[in-house]
């Protein structure tokens, strides 16, 4: 019996050893399979997804802008058939042309033309302005309060005022790029160049000898005249200056521009003061109207009370 028990114990011990031997390699292989799995996983980086999303949004934005531009270009050439097909619309803005009535429509800006289209009671109203004919572009305030307008003056003294512009500054910048023959005369206007470019001024070394020669020639001419002529005034030195075109020093134009820019803030301050005074007057008138209406309402209520008291106090008529 003891031998059998020992035999069973040895067999159990051997079986346990075999089981442990089989389980050990399995446990050693498990982390090896897990590690490469962790290494193969891509890093959780949100920047890649964000960049892909931003690229998609940019592509959508550009595609929308391209479709809108092509759509406006087709509308532009459909409405204004006299404009050549080579003209491409640079900007389209919704605005209103100020006339007897406000004509709401769209302003089409192209490299050589400024075109406005509006429809009133089924009738098309079109305005075509060549860029070359524009002489002045000035920022305009609607009713002297709302800074949402632009005034365009042509060489035929025709003035067009466009108001209700949502982005007046962007339209102004676009017109400044298109109208290359204009220059900024102030912060709020573009005007044509009043002083054309003069020829290069001659050096004083060339002018001074010529002036001396003229003076020398004028002196003997006055001596050779007959005595019958009593008095002949000599040619003044200023006459030599009149022979030459007036040339301003190079810094004079810069000084004039500085003076114009200094005068502009003063006019802005005057306009602001005038606007503030106007607002004060309007506010006082509104207060006066409110007080007068409240006083009239009070008087009406008192009269109603008096009428009610009189009607209750009077005796009722008896039936005969």
Swiss-Prot record:
GO biological process, one term: regulation of store-operated calcium entry
Signal peptide range: none
Domain GRAM, residue spans: 74-141
Organism: Mus musculus
Transmembrane spans: 278-298
Subcellular location: Endoplasmic reticulum membrane; Cell membrane
Region listing for Disordered, in residue ranges: 33-56
PANTHER family in the cross-refs: GRAM DOMAIN-CONTAINING PROTEIN 2A
Function as written in the Swiss-Prot or TrEMBL entry: Participates in the organization ofendoplasmic reticulum-plasma membrane contact sites (EPCS) with pleiotropic functions including STIM1 recruitment and calcium homeostasis. Constitutive tether that co-localize with ESYT2/3 tethers at endoplasmic reticulum-plasma membrane contact sites in a phosphatidylinositol lipid-dependent manner. Pre-marks the subset of phosphtidylinositol 4,5-biphosphate (PI(4,5)P2)-enriched EPCS destined for the store operated calcium entry pathway (SOCE).
CDD domains reported for this sequence: PH-GRAM_GRAMDC
InterPro entries: GRAM, PH-like_dom_sf, RAMD2A
Entry note about domains: GRAM domain is required for specific location to endoplasmic reticulum-plasma membrane contact sites (EPCS). Mediates interaction to phosphatidylinositol lipids and binding to plasma membrane.
Keywords tagged on the record: Cell membrane, Endoplasmic reticulum, Lipid-binding, Membrane, Phosphoprotein, Transmembrane, Transmembrane helix
Record PTM: Phosphorylated.
Mode of membrane association: Single-pass membrane protein; Peripheral membrane protein
Superkingdom per UniProt: Eukaryota
UniProt gene name: Gramd2a
Record Pfam families: GRAM
GO molecular function: phosphatidylinositol binding; phosphatidylinositol-4,5-bisphosphate binding
Protein name per Swiss-Prot or TrEMBL: GRAM domain-containing protein 2A
Taxonomic classification: Eukaryota, Metazoa, Chordata, Craniata, Vertebrata
CC terms in the record's Gene Ontology section: endoplasmic reticulum membrane; organelle membrane contact site; plasma membrane
